[in-house]
Amino acid sequence: MDTKQTDKQATFGADIRANLRMLKEALPAEDILVYEFTAGDGIACAAVYADGITDKELLGALVARPLAAAPAPKTREEVRRKLLFPEVKEADDLDAAGKEILAGNPALLVDGVRGALILGTKKVSLRAVAEPQTAIAIKGPREGFIEDIKTNMGLIRRRLKTPALRFIMLNVGKYSQTAVAIAYLDGVADKKAIRAIEARIRAADIDGVPDSSYIARFLARRPLSLFKQAGTTEKPDILCAKMLEGRIAVLADGSPIALTLPYMLTEDFQSAQDYFVSPYRATVSRILRLFAVCVSVFLPALYVAAQLFRLRLIPFGLLIIVSGGIRSIPLSPGLEMFFLLAVLEILVEASVRMPKYVALALSVIGALVLGDTAVKAGLVSSPAIIIVAIAGISAYTVPDLTGTLSLVRILYVVVAGSIGPYGIVLLTALLIWYLVSAESYGVPLLAPFAPLIRHDLADSLYKADLAALDRRPRALRGKNRTRLKLRRDAAAGREDEQPSGEGPDGQAADAAGEEKDA
């Protein structure tokens, strides 16, 4: 409802005709219908609802029939007691009732009774809870979020059965009035971060919120940053694990993607599978992901710089192969690499947006036919194609950073083709300076490495055993840092000293641990 065209202070009276006239003037859309019926003693009643998103059968069975069979009610409380529907709210003003009607919850008006009753008969067509295509799990839970915020909140509540789980409900969007939920664990998440996130969402001035990515734009401290500033996930088990560490979740109705804040860069090098395998295997996997990211970013630029400025850096045997491949290439190494990277991005974009059966054929054509034909025609060299292929594949070991890595990779190729190895070193220094100075709601983006937080290293690129994860990450600044107390020698009935300290909050161990970390 356009609040500029209606009077927010207009309130309902006891005359049903006057109330209906106000609603029709405020909601002139053709899909806003009125279901009129009579209660006991011939009292006129009406339910104003939005066609298509209101369950009309439920409206008739649980509202109209009980009122028709009962004596005429005189107050809203009497009307509420006669209804067979549990979800009933009161609305005194036109603005509140209009928003509920447009959300799918009809407003019930009874002649002689002041105000309206909002009935929770919203009809929503939902897809089933299923495994998200972007986060296929080999081991572990396979549930994923869907587009209904209430269902997503229920998936979180089912895993965190505690009164400490809190939800802050907001409506964002001038026209969409999208429901947005801020979820956190009271006593675990940082209060300052919660207030800052809530303030930014409340201050968002936007027409509509089709997806949670629109909310992420308002939560970003540096909107034009190359690197994302909020974590994302489609799986409730991953979200709950992050909330148990002290992070805050943001859900938006209509979006299966949840945002997590504060965000640290090391999150993207972690996988849900790391917690279902041994610490050694998880550590090796994380190091391999970091190595793959370095290969994806630096390999094309180093190839260009070595050809243009430092050809002697290439081993002699490899130099013979490379020189034979590039001898008749009309393009310079920098332009050749830039051209191949652009073709790679075009193929990726086309395969993502095409139907699956077309995308597979497109990938084969792009990888085999175009590559082989380009080499035979002498447009590009075979070593360059191999390097671009390795760089492209390596980027997908960290799917959430693929877009960022593509941009950074192109930047490195440009500076390598312009000023050689010195450009690579200079750009690397600038990126490190930028990442070190960036933060997400008081948490450094490169934590726990810059600044160095020893205890938090136990679950960064290195995955320690469960016993070493007795406290929550210090970087997240939560007050209650204790999350694990191991009881040893239980069979003998003896409990060893708990590493988390005494007391329910583990304050003694927290203080000792902070001194040790410092």
Predicted segments, located by residue:
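Membrane-embedded alpha-helical signal segments
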Residues: 1-302, 312, 316, 436-518
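Generic detector of multi-pass transmembrane helix bundles and their immediately adjacent loops
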Residues: 302, 315-501, 505, 516-518
